[in-house]
């Protein structure tokens, strides 16, 4: 049985808000077709292969949005999921998948790397690049889908790319903390407001970025040092978003760097310091709209914009609707 309810989604506009699928109640062909269709609708275009084509495929799937994320729980028999270069040309699939295994084990391959993910550990997959997900036996996992910009706003893109198809162990450290948090989110039955979900999801992605960094995903000590410097500047910006008078020179001084060094850090990520500052302010404004009852003018001021009209124009160009309409639309989705 499959149940679907449509919703807006920043990563894939046709993704169902709620998914429930149990192939046990379907015949072999229908069950496999529904499974493959759900994969494509939720994540990206893929091919699915089964080790025993004539055997019934037993699987269960439940998932829902959680703030900017989508969290699913999966129990399934052995199968293999392949995303090819040709599929990427027809379906960009601009998100990331966090595959957290809770029972059994799976193998993931991407960018010339392969790793086995054991219970309690997780691996990251980039939907914009070819990958293989292989489960040799029945398994259970939690899958968290994050829009690309949500993760890369917290961690340099090159570090994220180097971090795919690597097992982040969950027995100790940040990896274990993040893994337990994602399991708790997936298992949560109590209702939560849209605003609260946005806040918790944002914190969860912060923790995920920390776990990826602590997993020694940097290619060299120099890369790690640059990542730490960039993170320090980003934290200074985030702590001063409310200050409309802060200058880029002020930000550099607070981070203990020259303005030239700060510009080089952001240029290496394909952006500019000012562009990142504006994006951070817009993201803060979006959170205020979803988590508070502040007026649009107050939201504009809290996010560091001098002029509410200028803020509204930037917000509309970034998120596709005015601040007031965005709040109303997402309040309906949350309810």
UniProtKB/Swiss-Prot annotation:
<keyword id="KW-0805">Transcription regulation</keyword>
<dbReference type="InterPro" id="IPR018062">
    <property type="entry name" value="HTH_AraC-typ_CS"/>
</dbReference>
<dbReference type="Pfam" id="PF12833">
    <property type="entry name" value="HTH_18"/>
</dbReference>
<dbReference type="InterPro" id="IPR050204">
    <property type="entry name" value="AraC_XylS_family_regulators"/>
</dbReference>
<dbReference type="GO" id="GO:0003700">
    <property type="term" value="F:DNA-binding transcription factor activity"/>
</dbReference>
<keyword id="KW-0238">DNA-binding</keyword>
<dbReference type="GO" id="GO:0046196">
    <property type="term" value="P:4-nitrophenol catabolic process"/>
</dbReference>
<protein>
    <recommendedName>
        <fullName>Transcriptional activator NphR</fullName>
    </recommendedName>
</protein>
<dbReference type="InterPro" id="IPR020449">
    <property type="entry name" value="Tscrpt_reg_AraC-type_HTH"/>
</dbReference>
<feature type="DNA-binding region" description="H-T-H motif">
    <location>
        <begin position="249"/>
        <end position="270"/>
    </location>
</feature>
<dbReference type="GO" id="GO:0006355">
    <property type="term" value="P:regulation of DNA-templated transcription"/>
</dbReference>
<comment type="function">
    <text>Transcriptional activator of nphA1 and nphA2 involved in the degradation of 4-nitrophenol (4-NP).</text>
</comment>
<dbReference type="InterPro" id="IPR009057">
    <property type="entry name" value="Homeodomain-like_sf"/>
</dbReference>
<dbReference type="Pfam" id="PF14525">
    <property type="entry name" value="AraC_binding_2"/>
</dbReference>
<dbReference type="InterPro" id="IPR035418">
    <property type="entry name" value="AraC-bd_2"/>
</dbReference>
<feature type="DNA-binding region" description="H-T-H motif">
    <location>
        <begin position="296"/>
        <end position="319"/>
    </location>
</feature>
<keyword id="KW-0804">Transcription</keyword>
<dbReference type="GO" id="GO:0043565">
    <property type="term" value="F:sequence-specific DNA binding"/>
</dbReference>
<dbReference type="InterPro" id="IPR018060">
    <property type="entry name" value="HTH_AraC"/>
</dbReference>
<feature type="domain" description="HTH araC/xylS-type">
    <location>
        <begin position="231"/>
        <end position="329"/>
    </location>
</feature>
